């Protein structure tokens, strides 16, 4: 199988990640739940992971690095824990349902929600302008919630400029880094990010079931869940100290061990090298498919010759063929794994007018090869010729 669905999850990871997960499953106990060697080993590994990820993202305090099952849980913790009725939040048309649905729930509670539309004039590329976000700020605005990159088009958002706008107006800035963590440099301090939400199983090369959020000092998040913590057990309420405040229940120790190893392996390779390789594969793919009769490529790729930032995601359609049909042919006849449909990004499909057709998404990893990209392009050519 040629696996080109890395925006959903990476399958090929450094071998050391698999080894770390297995070793933790064999030898680590439950962190914070005893004084046995096994429990202490788990606690040490999780602490090491907090330290590593805090440094990786430019944070100041490892206690503010909270582990979750994925970015969806991290975003729910942030969105449901920060806002009260009567407050106002700004988000964008690019967002995944992991941002939109929690915000819609908050809207039902009386939180105002404004969605910044794409600013394209003429050809639709799916671009968000920071100035359009600033224009929607009101006296009751509390936060801006924004993705770092679209999971549908790969377009990268200028979060540094948005962070400056948020800080200028004394707003909280919450960033969904699901597609960029482990691919693009992220610095919480330099980008004025108050809450960074990330998943472990994509660019960070960790296992599924891992993720987290870094909670800045300005963000006072109410606990999303409560329960066992291993400390202060006579308290009726969840302890207020981070990370315990937001980490009720047993953590995914083996997964976190794998995530730690994934990040350490990324640092050995270097983010610049990872981005350059993925960018090269994406650009080669676009060059090969852009002249296919009936092909439509979605996103802002005009910057590619100048090496502008863009995640290695290419979403396409072939004339009026249903995206699910194209993806099914790619898998069953060519052994190429892609993702079809709406990709949990309904507002972007409304923007592009593809609500019914969906799109076929190709997403590349550092571990993909030029030969695989060539085979995928050739398969699209053959499918287009038969329509």
Outline where the language-model segments fall:
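Pyridoxal 5′-phosphate
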Residues: 1-387
């Amino acid at each position: 199988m040629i696996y080109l669905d890395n925006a959903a999850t990476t399958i090929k990871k450094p071998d050391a990640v698999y080894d770390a997960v297995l070793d933790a499953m064999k030898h680590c106990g439950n962190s914070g739940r005893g004084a046995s060697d096994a429990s202490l080993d788990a606690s040490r590994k999780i602490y090491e992971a907090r330290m590593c990820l805090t440094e990786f993202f430019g944070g100041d305090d490892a206690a503010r690095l909270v582990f979750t099952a994925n970015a969806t849980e991290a975003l729910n913790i942030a969105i449901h824990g920060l806002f009260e009725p009567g407050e106002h939040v700004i988000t964008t048309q690019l967002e995944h349902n992991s941002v939109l649905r929690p915000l819609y729930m908050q809207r039902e509670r009386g939180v105002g929600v404004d969605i910044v539309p794409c600013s394209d004039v003429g050809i639709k590329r799916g671009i968000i302008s920071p100035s359009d976000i600033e224009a929607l700020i009101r006296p009751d605005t509390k936060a801006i919630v924004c993705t770092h990159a679209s999971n549908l088009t790969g377009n990268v958002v200028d979060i540094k400029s948005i962070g400056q706008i948020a800080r200028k107006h004394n707003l909280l800035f919450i960033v969904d880094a699901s597609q960029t963590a482990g691919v693009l440099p992220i610095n919480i301090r330099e980008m004025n990010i108050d809450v960074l939400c990330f998943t472990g199983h994509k660019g960070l090369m960790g296992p599924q079931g891992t993720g987290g959020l870094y909670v800045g000092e300005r963000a006072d998040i109410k606990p999303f869940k409560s329960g066992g913590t291993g400390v202060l057990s006579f308290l009726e309420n969840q302890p207020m100290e981070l990370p315990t405040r937001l980490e009720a229940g047993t953590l995914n120790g083996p997964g976190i061990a794998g995530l730690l190893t994934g990040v350490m392996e990324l640092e050995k390779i270097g983010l610049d090298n990872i981005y350059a390789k993925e960018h090269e594969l994406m650009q080669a793919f676009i060059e090969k498919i852009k002249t296919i009769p009936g092909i439509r490529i979605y996103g802002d790729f005009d910057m590619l010759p100048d090496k502008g930032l863009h995640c290695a995601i290419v979403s396409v359609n072939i004339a009026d063929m249903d995206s699910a049909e194209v993806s099914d042919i790619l898998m069953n006849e060519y052994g190429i794994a892609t993702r079809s449909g709406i990709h949990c990004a309904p507002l972007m499909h409304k923007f592009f007018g593809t609500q019914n057709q969906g799109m076929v998404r190709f997403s590349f990893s550092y571990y993909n090869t030029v030969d695989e990209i060539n085979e995928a392009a050739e398969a699209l050519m053959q499918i287009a010729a038969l329509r």
